[in-house]
């Protein structure tokens, strides 16, 4: 056992999950299509339609005489440097930043190109857009084995000689070889990002809502794509009506049957088949179909009538083109965007919606219990990389809007348009620095960044492995504070503070590993080889879900699960990929997302 533990920690430190998450976020090493690069390529300012992101982010200027577009991509992080008062620069070390009350950070550069009336101008490469604080011991840190010895790469985990050389070099730079890193240095102070629990996205949870002495069955899902969350709620009312609420589209409830018609299922039999569960639920499905068909409030029997009803509810009094565009936006971008945002994905959304409704009806018939919200399969841990990703997404969009404004001013004053003369690097830097220095994060959260506890070595390690819950401390939340069986081997049962934080502030167990994002496409290619296909009839086999998205079906789900697990044991599929088979509902769930404690 001792050998196993030693080999585990020889490969990874006690704060490896924080460093690995940060490395996955930044463009460093072999991680060229990083999360930050994806954010830059997904920037859309001044346009609502779809644009091919292979050419990078898109900024369209609001000028009358020309069609001017800015494309941006290829974000890079330089080495951490210090700029002196005389303008000179030199590589920095964490110890120098501590002693001089400076921030340990690197310059951020992006390639820009101005396109006038479809004619591209010469690229402006390596334009500095700001600075990014660097995590100590990350791949971009000057103390990393890839950088500390100059051009020579050290391999301290596999070579004893390199390990000794690395430790000697660390001592020369004033660093403790036993310090694991995993924190930032902001204005000379060491600050750590606290991991937070979050509900798993793209996962359906059913619960009973008891409000005003009324019991209603509710299903909820947080559909997430490219960092944007679109909550959706399906509720069975006391009169038996099944209603959908799309939070981003207002409070207007939509009958499930009407919404399924709008998504392209005209046939009553198809709607019935998509929802049908136990025989006790049949009467509710038929009643809902009849209500939408016959009730004067709805009177919707086909897709065209369903679209007209939605137009009256969500774009009343507007021009026809606007009404149609608003409904298309509702169905494609605001309704379950993780399943796709194209018109061709609507049938799949209708099938997924039917599955959600079936779960609500099964719970209403008491054949199923509500989901356990405290089960750790329903949670994800947001690490340093995820928190930096959220912050960088907001900061880069703010930078793009400011650049658009400055370019429009220059154009209106008949000046030459150059990115370097219009871009203000302090917009990005100040936004990121303020959040890390104060702990006030995007989304209204506070206390995300904290001063690292250096009371003892163990106190520092404990602080960097802390996991907090976003729940309000002043409320009881008895079940959330209790130990749960799924905490076994993942969270420490003893280390939690006394007082109002008890049970809401936890610490990771010693040998946990937290999953990083694994490419869905690699898993989908494996599924194609295992005879998973996209059908015309989604009820013709076992549905295969990849990160909540219905990818296809398979005729024999048990065989697929067996072959998938066999491929995972052989190393063809990464060990972090999980698979679960729900034989009762004929669903196979595969997860490759980040934040799962393994």
Identify the residue ranges that each predicted region occupies:
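Extended hydrophobic-aromatic, low-complexity segments
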Residues: 502-504, 516
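Flexible, glycine/threonine-enriched loop-and-boundary segments that flank and lead into catalytic domains
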Residues: 161-171, 463-493
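N-terminal non-catalytic structural scaffold regions of very large proteins
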Residues: 1-456, 460, 509-598
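Single, functionally critical "micro-switch" positions that shape active/binding sites
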Residues: 186-187, 498, 502
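Conserved helicase core region in the C-terminal RecA-like lobe
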Residues: 491-498, 505
């Amino acid at each position: 056992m001792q050998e196993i533990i030693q080999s585990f920690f020889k490969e990874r430190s006690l704060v490896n999950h924080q460093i690995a998450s940060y490395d996955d976020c930044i463009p460093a090493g072999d991680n060229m299509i990083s999360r930050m690069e994806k954010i830059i390529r997904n920037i859309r300012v001044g346009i609502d339609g779809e644009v091919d992101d292979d050419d990078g982010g898109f900024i369209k200027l609001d000028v009358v005489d020309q069609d001017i577009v800015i494309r941006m991509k290829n974000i890079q992080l330089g080495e951490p440097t210090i700029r002196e008062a005389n303008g000179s620069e030199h590589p920095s070390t964490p110890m120098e930043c501590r002693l001089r009350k400076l921030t340990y950070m690197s310059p951020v550069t992006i390639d820009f190109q101005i396109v006038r009336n479809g004619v591209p101008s010469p690229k402006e490469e390596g334009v500095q857009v700001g600075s990014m604080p660097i995590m100590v011991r990350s791949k971009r840190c000057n103390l990393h084995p890839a950088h500390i010895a100059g051009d020579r790469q050290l391999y301290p985990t596999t070579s004893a000689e390199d390990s000794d050389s690395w430790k000697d070099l660390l001592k020369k730079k004033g660093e403790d070889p036993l310090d694991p890193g995993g924190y930032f240095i902001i204005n000379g102070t060491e600050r750590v990002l606290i991991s937070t629990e979050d509900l798993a996205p793209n996962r359906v949870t059913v619960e009973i809502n008891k409000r005003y002495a009324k019991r209603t069955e509710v299903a909820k899902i947080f559909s997430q794509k490219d960092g944007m969350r679109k909550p959706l709620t399906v509720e069975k009312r006391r009169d038996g009506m099944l209603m959908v609420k799309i939070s981003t589209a207002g409070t207007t409830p939509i009958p499930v049957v009407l919404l399924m018609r709008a998504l392209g299922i005209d046939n009553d039999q198809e709607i019935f088949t998509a929802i049908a569960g136990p025989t006790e639920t049949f009467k509710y499905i038929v009643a809902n179909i009849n209500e939408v068909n016959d009730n004067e409030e709805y009177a919707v029997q086909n897709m065209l009538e369903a679209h007209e009803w939605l137009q009256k509810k969500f774009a009343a009094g507007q021009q026809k083109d606007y009404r149609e565009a608003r409904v298309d936006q509702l169905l494609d971008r605001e309704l379950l965007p993780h399943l796709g945002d194209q018109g061709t994905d609507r049938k799949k959304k209708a099938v997924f919606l039917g599955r959600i409704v079936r779960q609500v009806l099964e719970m209403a018939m008491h054949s199923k219990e509500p989901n356990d919200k405290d089960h750790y399969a329903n949670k994800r841990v947001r690490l340093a990389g995820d928190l930096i990703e959220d912050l960088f997404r907001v900061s880069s969009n703010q930078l793009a809007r400011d650049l658009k404004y400055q370019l429009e001013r220059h154009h209106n004053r008949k000046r030459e348009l150059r990115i370097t003369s219009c871009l203000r690097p302090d917009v990005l830097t100040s936004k990121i620095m303020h959040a890390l220095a104060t702990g006030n994060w995007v989304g209204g959260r506070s206390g995300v960044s904290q001063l690292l506890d250096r009371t003892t070595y163990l106190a520092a390690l404990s602080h960097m492995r802390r996991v907090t819950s976003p729940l309000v401390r002043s409320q009881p939340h008895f079940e959330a504070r209790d130990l749960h069986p799924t905490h076994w081997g993942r969270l420490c049962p003893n280390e939690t503070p006394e007082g109002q934080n008890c049970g809401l502030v936890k610490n990771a167990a010693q040998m946990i590993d937290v999953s990083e994002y694994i490419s869905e496409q690699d898993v989908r290619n494996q599924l194609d080889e295992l005879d998973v296909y996209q059908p015309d009839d989604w009820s013709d086999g076992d549905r295969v879900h990849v990160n909540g998205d219905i990818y296809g079906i398979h005729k024999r789900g048990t065989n697929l699960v067996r072959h998938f697990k066999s491929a995972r044991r052989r190393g063809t599929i990464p060990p972090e990929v999980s698979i679960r088979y729900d034989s009762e509902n004929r669903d196979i769930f595969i997860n490759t997302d980040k934040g799962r404690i393994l």
